[in-house]
């Protein structure tokens, strides 16, 4: 993707995250870029086309991050073996990388804020919010704990909620924080403690079975 196309996507996303999708016009996007609407339409057909490409870009980045962190890229139904092979060390690294990505990467942070802002106004935005920030991550971790740790679905679901609940909260805290670095440190610490507690409890359980 060329630089101009990337610039259009990021600029549009900034405006969507600040003003909302419906309230942002193609004229506003073009004006923020210092170009005419005619020039903008040479790259994207309309505002909807811009948004569709933003979502496509997020899907690409999502898969790339999972691949880089040695985590399952697809669903449990399609790649069950990838879930079984995943280590808790990899899950810990990935979780911290995800927090940094959703808060520190401008493209991802703006996308998150857009979905948070629009989830109650637009059914599609609500679905994307659930996919990327709520039910999607919770289900992903449930599947991971079920196969990687050999837990039943009920226990895996409880573990996933115990893990992801604080992480989800830290996203909201980060956005209004006077000291974002301190929030990042606290979020990373919470993730580390979760996996440390899991290892400790797992060792105790293993010893009691001997």
Per-region residue spans from a language model:
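Short alpha-helical scaffolding segments that buttress acidic/His motifs in well-ordered protein cores
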Residues: 98, 112-116, 163-167, 194
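Hydrophobic alpha-helical connector segments
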Residues: 66-105, 159-160
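Short, Lys/Arg-enriched anionic-surface-contact patches
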Residues: 1-4
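Hydrophobic/aromatic-rich alpha-helical bundle segments in the mid-to-C-terminal region
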Residues: 127-131, 135, 145-193, 203-210
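Short, basic, alpha-helical segments at the C-terminal edge of helix-turn-helix-like DNA-binding modules
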Residues: 56-62, 69
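Amphipathic alpha-helical packing segments from all-alpha helical-bundle domains
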Residues: 103-116, 120-150
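Helix-turn-helix
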Residues: 7, 11, 15-57
